[in-house]
Amino acid sequence: MKIALIAHDKKKEEMIELAKDFEDKLSKHILVATGTTGLKIMQNTSLEVKRCKSGPLGGDQEIGAMVANHDVDMVIFLRDPLTAQPHEPDISALLRLCDVYKVPLATNTESAKLIMADI
């Protein structure tokens, strides 16, 4: 299974903790992430992560293309709903593609834990 991991700046620490908590399970899958999120996960765990560009530089769109090409099976996107994002259209497009292609999507830690408990 290929899992995409994305986290806004204020949610990166939550993503690191999530990756640590589920490191054994995640290590059995192919992981892809936006640039900074992937780097931070690799710096804080033993997980290997293929890094795309940073979200604002097109990383969300790269992962969206993977979703559209049936190349990603699940997306964990820890969003910061209280901070405006300059690349909000890219984020909306990614979320829409997950719905269109019926790719499981978690946008907060609690939903991510529920999904990851089942992988």
UniProtKB/Swiss-Prot annotation:
Signal peptide: none annotated. The keyword Lyase applies. Keywords: Lyase. The gene is mgsA. This is Methylglyoxal synthase. GO terms for molecular function: methylglyoxal synthase activity. Catalyzes the formation of methylglyoxal from dihydroxyacetone phosphate. The keyword Amino-acid biosynthesis does not apply. One of its GO terms (cellular component) is cytosol. Belongs to the methylglyoxal synthase family. Disulfide bonds: none annotated.
